[in-house]
Amino acid sequence: SAKVNATKTMHAQTVKYISAEIQKCSLGEANFMGTDQDCPATAAKAVTGAVNTMNDKNPYSTANKAIRSSTAFNEGYVSLSATNTTTIQVNTCTKTGCATADKMTATISTD
């Protein structure tokens, strides 16, 4: 469905965006996530910055932003959490019910 595909795309774009923004600190920039966060990048700063700067809407609930600080799997949400100072966990559910096949996960390192 279009909602499933939209959620899968958001998951991939979120991982790509966070990774690219963290890289800015490695390249000597003073800020990342626009000017929302100061370098050096930590997992917590990356989560906060992504939630503050990404405005994608949840395709299942368009009044809500899809990118959020959470560990939960709920349809249409890309949940971000700092596992430790250097690891960001990304948990996404693409379809109502969130069966195992409908869950996407990724980890991003700030190192």
PLM feature segments, named:
Residues 19-111:
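Periplasmic/extracellular, small/polar-rich flexible segments of pilin-like filament-forming proteins
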